[in-house]
Amino acid sequence: MLHDALGTRFSAAVVRVEQGGRLRYERAFGRTRSAEPSVPCFPDTRFDIASITKVFVSAIALDDVAGGRLALDATLTDLVPEWRGTPHEDITLRRILAHLAGFKSGADYRTLLDKNVEAFALTEPLAAPPGAHVLYSDLGFIALGTILARATPGRSAAGRIESRLAAMGATSTAYRPRGIERPTIPATETDAWRGAVQGEVHDEKAYLMGGVAGHAGLFGTARDVAELGNWYLAALHRRPTPLDPALAREAVVEAGHDDVLRRGLGWALKTSDENSCGALMSPSTFGHTGFTGTSIWVDPARDLSVVLLTNAVHFGRSDIRPIRAGVADAVVRAMDGT
């Protein structure tokens, strides 16, 4: 399946499968871009993981809750005084993590070229009252990045997030790759605004923020993305985890839903339309996707995580949901021996 998609849907891919916290399968495919110069993709190649950034940042937020720096259900006006006396003052960390805060889904980057994106995210009128319904939002997680930075002042947002993730075991996950690293990172899209994008964040809002944001911007390996899933699997299966076990378990049960979406705290949960996790993973499955062509799906019933990293926007913005689902189903069949 992945061989068939190389050269038409993406130029590079890595699949990693872990079960019980142990590596069961890992393979890299393709090259970093379709045109020369390019280099081969390896298992430890770093990809722009796009919105999987949200789940890494959510893990840091939960760690802040465990450490007493934040609270899930308290209002946030002490850290975000811009929200006092506005509908935003009813926003809580739980509502941000579950996409229940009422933020608009996003904004066309062309409307933000002359704006401070962080200030825009904090002050743009809400699309719904906090707590009313699920509305998946980049703006909410841009605000979350600001909240985390203000909760522990004195360090840059990037430095704080990167150091925390490294301490938790995601040692290759970081913002803004160095220039020497960029040719080794799979290229994303070529567009009229920025030209060929390689080694810089694809997401336009994160790019306008200097490459560092709570909703996108991290680059990471398949191993680190699988490690993220393992922090939560370990809590569910009573193994050591860098997260507070009770909070990790709470994060992967439903905190909000609508007719299509089910959300945990940072995570998407399997729905009746199967998301992109296929038909065979258990109903308790949780995961997340990234617009660049990345995904992780975690099946607690099988103690299984499936990571697929690609640069699917390299040839355009076509939907790779069938490929993601096909990979997940193939892994489950192999693990189940069917």
Language model: regions and residue ranges:
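Short loop/turn microsegments at loop-to-beta-strand junctions
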Residues: S11-A13, T292-S295
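Short, well-ordered beta-strand elements
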Residues: I296-W297, D303-A312
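Short active-site loop at a secondary-structure junction
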Residues: L6-V14, E36-R95, L126-L139, A213-A216
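Short, P/G- and charge-enriched loop/turn segments at secondary-structure junctions
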Residues: L2-D4, R46, P130, V253, ...
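Generic C-terminus detector
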Residues: H314-G337
